[in-house]
Curated annotation (Swiss-Prot):
<dbReference type="GO" id="GO:0045182">
    <property type="term" value="F:translation regulator activity"/>
</dbReference>
<keyword id="KW-0809">Transit peptide</keyword>
<dbReference type="GO" id="GO:0005759">
    <property type="term" value="C:mitochondrial matrix"/>
</dbReference>
<protein>
    <recommendedName>
        <fullName>Protein PET111, mitochondrial</fullName>
    </recommendedName>
</protein>
<dbReference type="GO" id="GO:0005743">
    <property type="term" value="C:mitochondrial inner membrane"/>
</dbReference>
<dbReference type="GO" id="GO:0070131">
    <property type="term" value="P:positive regulation of mitochondrial translation"/>
</dbReference>
<keyword id="KW-0496">Mitochondrion</keyword>
<keyword id="KW-0810">Translation regulation</keyword>
<comment type="function">
    <text>Required for translation of the mitochondrial gene for cytochrome c oxidase subunit II (COX2).</text>
</comment>
<keyword id="KW-0010">Activator</keyword>
<dbReference type="GO" id="GO:0005739">
    <property type="term" value="C:mitochondrion"/>
</dbReference>
<dbReference type="GO" id="GO:0033617">
    <property type="term" value="P:mitochondrial cytochrome c oxidase assembly"/>
</dbReference>
<comment type="similarity">
    <text>To yeast YHR160C.</text>
</comment>
């Protein structure tokens, strides 16, 4: 079960109502005396002799420690006075006089070797620097954007912080906590951020931007409910927590990523009530058009007419003028494009679309950011419908707009076309020839790697584990994680392989879950495998009550697993959750239920009556008739598989012919699914000639190059239908089994070639990413050198 971290709501309340006159107590230590006469020697020798002098001195640090209320992370020390006494007796703190002689200059210049020296002194020599001394180095490192090194300092000194804080003034300690909070957020150490944020709001004058940082940390560490709870209590304490409209926008934008509409409505309407409910409220508290657009977009997406009307007629919303703005019209227009994605009965009328785009461009002449949003929405619409020709048309229009450049966000959207159509080589070429060759304008970002990674795994599923391991070995290097602080977390969150049984073997791919849902699904599978129904129910229940709201892919996978394991009651609950949370429910959900109904009915009777069998066949045909315009290739093939249970092979032939008509001939995966289902149908019909003809067609089709070990295994299994049941096969329709085996052998050779191609592309991808990472590191070092010069100049001015 996922555990809540940080502090309770009562803990929040105590922090919210802190004492304004609270001061940090100062404690005086008796520090051992040591000589500095050796400073005439080399600096390294100075330090060594100084440390030796410390070790020879038998006196101990002593002083008075006035205990203060601490949070959980300090409890291990402060709950037991003897623990702090032990630290006092074991560790020496550098005297300011000697720090100025031996260390200050190196701290100010952020000497490259100083970090290892600090770690070594604390670990091996029991020597510590004060927080005030450390801040000199930390500020220099932060200016140079060496957050990884600051993180190392925090890790080394975390256990000593209560000791050092006890003789540090409140202002200095607050500076230390604030910069550490920012750095840990940059490092994506969100659990640590929770702890530091608790200290920050206790000892610092809270800044608005730090509230955003804290809220984001809660959400990213799966403490969504705590984030909402903190926001709810903090918004009513403006003197302590100066939340501005910008924080509202950033909080909602963060929540939008997880489609948590319930929390978003609470956040938004609470703002209107507290910040805009009074006639004397400041106009700066009115929600901006950007904020209103988020709520508007989400309400349209969840298709709740009553709630949408309530939002649009709200007095505060009306007072902003949003409903009569071009931004309002743009959201409505973009939503109409979004709806096309989920409805095959609709298509984009290119002439009307471009006409409306041109009108928006004219009206948005002075609003560059909103104009960019318009272009992005149209690009997304064409990508979602795999319309590459018209995608090029809109890109040409963007290129003619002097105020808009095709940057990384556009590249991510455009390259999604290649991911959707499983064209790894096209995607690789696009990144190599377009994205990376922009003279450093398009910098490396995690989403670029994720696209290349997931596309490679989708196109070469038999190499999913090899590709993932190769990327991990290549990118999980210390020189990368030190400079690109997001690398380690990114790899950990995305290196989840999801394996499922398909086509007689295993089909592996990247899970598609976020890190939280992946953990939930693994726990759910474990409960189901142990027949722990109550535990499985608890996983679903907790996913709704705790942390980030569950996403569609997680709930769909849970539903499928429930039906496969006959957990019908729980499956119905999950189905209700799905249909409540998401506006667009793909047909594959209804097909899951149709398959379950037909199979469960079929298994309920040893021998179905002709009447009952016809009833099941009618349900299947009626489903196809009602949803004919919406059915995708995959849907038709799923319905064909259901026909095998009713033994309605004639109707199965019709369904598979419909799948062929709708098949995207450039999509490798669709070809594989089509051929495998066709071969299964031929074997069930005991038509060896048809079986051989399909194999021949597959071998001749160079666009259908995706073949997996599972395909080969299952095709060989199909052969048993002809070998064991010759009585069912008519002489006229039968052919020599040797011919079929020869064609299977040919398919095996094609598989070997395809796997070799995948290994070669895997090698190219790894080299490409390594090269891109190295170039990014070089750019970062150049930028760091420029900042070093500025830092040197600043230090020189201070000395003068």
């Amino acid at each position: 079960m996922l555990q809540r971290r940080f502090i309770s709501s009562s803990g929040i309340k105590r922090l919210l109502h802190r004492e304004s006159n609270k001061v940090m107590h100062t404690v005086f230590f008796k520090v051992r005396y040591y000589s500095t006469e050796l400073i005439k020697k080399k600096h390294k020798e100075d330090i060594e002799d100084w440390v030796k002098a410390q070790l020879k001195d038998s006196s101990t640090i002593s002083g008075v420690y006035e205990s203060r209320n601490k949070l959980d992370w300090m409890d291990s020390i402060t709950k037991s006075p003897s623990s702090l006494d032990i630290l006092k007796n074991q560790y020496n703190i550098v005297k300011d006089k000697d720090f100025g002689i031996l260390w200050k200059q190196k701290f100010e210049s952020a000497d490259p070797d100083i970090l290892m020296t600090i770690i070594s002194l604390s670990t091996n020599q029991k020597v510590l620097f004060s927080i005030q001394q450390l801040l000199i180095l930390i500020n220099s490192l932060h200016f140079l954007k060496r957050d990884y090194d600051i993180g190392q300092i925090y890790t080394t000194y975390e256990q000593f912080t209560p000791l050092l804080a006890s003789h540090t003034d409140k202002g200095t300690y607050g500076q230390f906590i604030e910069i550490m909070l920012v750095v840990q957020h940059n490092l994506h150490h969100f659990d640590v951020c929770e702890t530091l944020f608790a200290e920050y709001i206790k000892y610092c004058k809270v800044k608005p931007q730090m509230i955003s940082l804290g809220l984001n940390s809660f959400i990213r560490s799966n403490n969504t409910q705590l984030a909402v709870e903190f926001y709810t209590q903090a918004i009513t304490n403006p003197d302590t927590f100066p939340i501005t409209e910008k924080q509202l926008f950033e909080f909602l934008r963060c929540m939008e990523r997880y489609l948590d509409m319930s929390s978003m409505k609470h956040i938004f309407y609470l703002w209107l009530k507290v910040k805009c409910g009074d006639e004397q409220s400041s106009s700066t508290n009115l929600p901006s058009f950007k904020t209103l657009a988020i709520i508007h977009r989400m309400l349209l997406r969840f298709s709740n007419t009553d709630e949408l009307n309530d939002f649009l007629t709200n007095p505060v919303v009306l007072s902003t003028g949003y409903t009569s703005s071009v931004q309002f019209e743009l959201i409505e227009f973009c939503h109409s494009l979004y709806c096309i994605k989920g409805d095959r009965t609709k298509s984009i009328d290119d002439s009307i679309l471009m006409e409306r785009v041109d009108k928006f461009i004219t009206r948005l002449n002075n609003n560059i950011s909103t104009r960019k949003e318009l272009y992005m929405s149209v690009v997304q619409a064409y990508v979602s419908t795999n319309n590459f020709e018209n995608l090029k048309v809109i890109l040409e229009k963007i290129q003619r707009d002097n105020d808009i450049s095709i940057d990384g966000s556009f590249h991510l959207c455009i390259s999604r076309y290649f991911v959707n159509t499983n064209q790894f080589e096209g995607l690789f070429k696009y990144y190599r020839s377009v994205v990376k060759t922009t003279d450093g304008k398009t910098r490396l970002r995690p989403a670029f790697i994720q696209q290349l990674w997931s596309c490679a795994v989708n196109v070469y599923p038999m190499l999913a584990k090899e590709i993932t391991n190769d990327l991990l070995v290549t990118l999980k290097r210390s020189q990368y994680s030190k400079c690109l602080t997001w690398v380690y977390t990114f790899l950990q969150e995305n290196a989840h392989i999801h394996t499922r049984k398909i086509n007689g073997g295993e089909d592996s791919s990247l899970s598609g879950f976020n890190a939280v849902d992946f953990e939930r699904f693994e726990e759910f599978k474990k409960k189901v495998s142990h027949n722990d129904v109550y535990g499985a129910e608890l996983v679903i229940s907790n996913s709704l009550k705790e942390g980030i709201a569950p996403q569609f892919s997680f709930l769909y996978s849970v539903l499928a697993l429930c039906l496969r394991n006959s957990l019908t009651g729980l499956a119905r609950v999950v189905d209700v959750i799905l249909r409540t949370r998401f506006r667009y429910i793909p047909l594959k959900v209804d097909i899951l239920w149709l398959k379950w109904e037909i199979i469960s009915n079929y298994r309920s009777f040893e021998k179905l009556s002709a009447e009952h069998l016809k009833e099941l066949e009618f349900k299947l045909k009626e489903f196809e008739r009602v949803h004919q315009k919406e059915l995708s290739v995959q849907n038709y093939l799923q319905l064909t598989q259901i026909c095998f249970h009713t033994r309605d092979f004639k109707y199965a032939c019709y369904l598979i012919s419909q799948a062929r008509k709708n098949l995207d001939t450039s999509n490798n995966k669709q070809w594989m699914m089509y051929y495998m289902t066709s071969l299964k149908l031929a074997s069930r019909m005991h038509e060896s000639e048809r079986f051989s003809r399909i194999l021949k067609d597959w071998n001749c089709n160079h666009r259908a190059s995706l073949i997996t070990p599972g395909c080969i295994r299952q095709i060989k299994g199909f052969m048993k239908y002809f070998e064991k049941r010759p009585a069912y096969i008519s002489t006229a329709a039968s052919i020599d089994n040797k011919e079929i085996k020869d064609r299977i052998d040919e398919l095996v050779l094609r598989y070997v070639d395809y796997k070799y191609q995948g290994l070669e592309n895997m090698r190219k991808l790894t080299l490409f990413l390594k090269e891109w990472f190295d170039e990014e590191i070089s750019l970062l070092k150049l930028e760091q050198n420029e900042r070093k010069m500025k830092l040197f100049e600043e230090n020189k001015k201070e000395e003068e």
